[in-house]
């Protein structure tokens, strides 16, 4: 991708019975994805590969995150481009 115009996450919303990976697609080359909770706290850092990043729905300690809206903030490592997508987790 040359920009983040096609950025999306799936599945979204994430239903209580789903325990698979959440995929963030439409990333540019060399993108870091920071997952933030509704209060803006850092939950997880992901590295984009092949235009996508995969989140297991867990925080950095390996614990499943609480229900709520999370924001995947996507930044190129050069800092030139950024965008975000919201993900609803229902547990």
Where are these regions (language model features)?
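Glycine-centered coil/turn sites that cap beta-strands in beta-rich domains
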Residues: 1-34, 52, 80
